[in-house]
Amino acid sequence: MANRKLEKMASIDVHLRQLVPGKVSEDDKLVEYDALLLDRFLDILQDLHGEDLRETVQELYEHSAEYEGKHEPKKLEELGSVLTSLDPGDSIVIAKAFSHMLNLANLAEEVQIAYRRRIKKLKKGDFVDESSATTESDLEETFKKLVGDLNKSPEEIFDALKNQTVDLVLTAHPTQSVRRSLLQKHGRIRDCLAQLYAKDITPDDKQELDEALQREIQAAFRTDEIKRTPPTPQDEMRAGMSYFHETIWKGVPKFLRRVDTALKNIGIEERVPYNAPLIQFSSWMGGDRDGNPRVTPEVTRDVCLLARMMAATMYFNQIEDLMFEMSMWRCNDELRARADEVHANSRKDAAKHYIEFWKSIPTTEPYRVILGDVRDKLYHTRERAHQLLSNGHSDVPVEATFINLEQFLEPLELCYRSLCSCGDRPIADGSLLDFLRQVSTFGLSLVRLDIRQESDRHTDVLDAITTHLDIGSYREWSEERRQEWLLSELSGKRPLFGSDLPKTEEIADVLDTFHVIAELPADSFGAYIISMATAPSDVLAVELLQRECRVKQPLRVVPLFEKLADLEAAPAAVARLFSVDWYKNRINGKQEVMIGYSDSGKDAGRLSAAWQLYKAQEELVKVAKEYGVKLTMFHGRGGTVGRGGGPTHLAILSQPPDTINGSLRVTVQGEVIEQSFGEEHLCFRTLQRFTAATLEHGMRPPISPKPEWRALLDEMAVVATEEYRSVVFQEPRFVEYFRLATPELEYGRMNIGSRPSKRKPSGGIESLRAIPWIFAWTQTRFHLPVWLGFGSAIRHVIEKDVRNLHMLQDMYQHWPFFRVTIDLIEMVFAKGDPGIAALYDKLLVSEELWPFGEKLRANFEETKKLILQTAGHKDLLEGDPYLKQRLRLRDSYITTLNVCQAYTLKRIRDPSYHVTLRPHISKEIAESSKPAKELIELNPTSEYAPGLEDTLILTMKGIAAGLQNTG
């Protein structure tokens, strides 16, 4: 591509360079990376759409940069007048260009982080974004800290590590707003950029990489960013599973090798046993039916079979490599006898359909004989799952397949033992050990599927049963009566109902789900989670339904407490459950409880939710200890701060003491999956962070808060909840204001997830799901649900006694939980901009509601000031120049998209809004005989004026990418 250097075009570089704060060090290549990607992109844009369009992008960027300098509302209006003068086709191209530039800025940032990590100039434990995290929980560092600072012996560390489990639960929450087709192209752009800056690159390599970089940037820009149909749960499952294929499958053994190395460095010569459950994976995709009518029993069945087929395929693809390696002839007697037996029973022509080792394997290669048999079984296991998935039945006999994990591990363990006993331990600890570790981690099911259902749906089923049996209405019984009946049925043997039970569609759906659980292998499933659980009968009901539907190995039942009142009542509910003898005997000393971050935040605001979650965990652990039960907390965190997100290791280290105890389950949601597992190095970093932080929390628990800190926070939480609820639930016109001032009503058009955005189609804020609630406020850069309530709470305690300010500063310095809470809010303020929110108000909100918006913005400014006072900071993010720089580099792009979104919403909602269009500026559109049509025709069914809907969706995606948050 001609290397045009138009005078005008140099200015984006200039702006970028001016934005860099002086403090950022020499090793920082971010601006260089950013400028390179941008230059390439603008060249491509000019080639495709002409110089005029490139100049318009430039002009918009400059207006935005000027606004970022002084925050004058006039600048936003100038931006608006340029944007509204564009014709529909150009408008789509511009929105797409800015969205694309933000994605490129994110990629530049990721490459820069990897570069800085390599040159070891990392400060440990800063507070920043998850994705950029210079926040580290490095295993080597953690081990050194535990041995050096805490005098833990290497043996104690090894013991704790062998017995700890982190279970990462992938959920397809509708927050992954980037299409998979684009994610793959982004990965290749990242690779090209990293290689371009490698030390030993030749001129030819450089030229080829540069061409590849341009090709990938153009391919990404030419891909439709918008999903034209909503994904089904099966699509979500396949998208989630693709991460296993791409990074997790190979990432786990690689990570466990690094654990071995780190242990060796502190003097432990043993390796982590291959069956130590250090990392486990579960999934909600296709199992989470809470409020999602599209997740049917058939979907659950399909998803389990698909995962089994994928697991068998990945093992099968690896087994031949292992056979190549295992060419040894020395073996112990046990293996020799088995190999002879397998050889005698094998058919000569049985292996014709394999590429390698297709003839009968001689007994002089005993390991290959054994592994050949494993290969046959894997082949049949895969075929059977494939046939069951395709047509519901299979002609592959079950005995030709692997039925359970023990059966799969047994021949591999035999090979391992034999190699060790013949002096070939180093060989055993090679690929065979990696394979054993994969089998132990992924099993035959790849992931274990959790089932989640609302407690009301179980009540409906039991009510139908008791009504049918003429013993009354279960729904109307008291909790005592319910428990008494459930326990008498659980202790008895008779079946409760037959095929004559009258069933509505909903009841059949619940019962059929239990039948699917009974039909499929037990290792396909993890937990049965009950949302909106409040009482012991909710848990006993699921136990009874599992028994009635003949589930041979019942799933563990996990109550989920989400709303503030439910969290407060959770310890008492769990204590009542443990006091039921039947249940206590059933659980074998182990119980899991899930706590929800999203709904509690929507219900009471971030401060009260965070504090209540902290207290509920402390209380739950006390209750469990009292009854001699080991409790696992399952954290339902979202990606955004409003939904419990934030850097992993800080989140773990700020949990109350004693609440993790080497066993942690946590959801990895939506776009966080891509940030955690999108690349090999990200996957490694994620596994390392979770493992190191869980170990550190157990061996070096955070301090318990002082009684006076608790009392202060209790008082603050009451004030914060009062203010939050007085605005969100009690202000009569709030819902109207929210719907006008944000793109909430238009959110559903993004086709991100398979779940409806509301629990009930009518209804106000209560029925809105937490994700669109947060999404809408994130889009306007106002982030209301995150900070609302903090300001009045801090102001209240300082006005009451000025010494409380010192106490708050003391809490910030010495109490990890409080520090993390305040730091997260500070980061959100750094991403916020009330000036942008004011533009939405001016354009979209009716005039009589303007004072309401002004009041909220004044509250934003006051809260920001008080948060800085509490942290002892003069300026937002003053302790983290890197994050500050990165946010400033993104702001000008995001501002253009915000203004574009606000004016587009105005035109969608008010068709009579007058705009003066200028002629086409895109060369591609102007020179085409069908002007602007092509882009607009991608969305032929839009009910709005041409191009508006696509422009709106592109701005939503761009802003989400820029803030690195969707919902």
From Swiss-Prot:
It is found in: Cytoplasm. Keywords: Allosteric enzyme, Carbon dioxide fixation, Cytoplasm, Lyase, Magnesium, Manganese, Phosphoprotein, Photosynthesis. It is an enzyme of class 4 (lyase). Belongs to the PEPCase type 1 family. NCBIfam families: PRK00009.1. Magnesium. Can also use manganese. It comes from Arabidopsis thaliana (Mouse-ear cress). InterPro entries: PEP_COase, PEP_COase_bac/pln-type, PEP_COase_Lys_AS, PEPCASE_His_AS, Pyrv/PenolPyrv_kinase-like_dom. GO terms for cellular component: apoplast; cytosol; nucleus. This is Phosphoenolpyruvate carboxylase 1. Coiled coil: none annotated. The gene is PPC1. It catalyses: oxaloacetate + phosphate = phosphoenolpyruvate + hydrogencarbonate. The keyword Protease does not apply. GO terms for biological process: carbon fixation; cellular response to phosphate starvation; leaf development; photosynthesis; protein tetramerization; tricarboxylic acid cycle. Optimum pH is 8-9. Through the carboxylation of phosphoenolpyruvate (PEP) it forms oxaloacetate, a four-carbon dicarboxylic acid source for the tricarboxylic acid cycle. Contributes probably to the adaptation to inorganic phosphate (Pi) deprivation. Its main location: cytoplasm. GO terms for molecular function: phosphoenolpyruvate carboxylase activity. Pfam families: PEPcase. Its cofactor is Mg(2+); Mn(2+). By light-reversible phosphorylation. Activated by inorganic phosphate (Pi) deprivation and glucose 6-phosphate. Inhibited by L-malate and L-aspartate. The modification Phosphoserine is found at residues 11, 704.
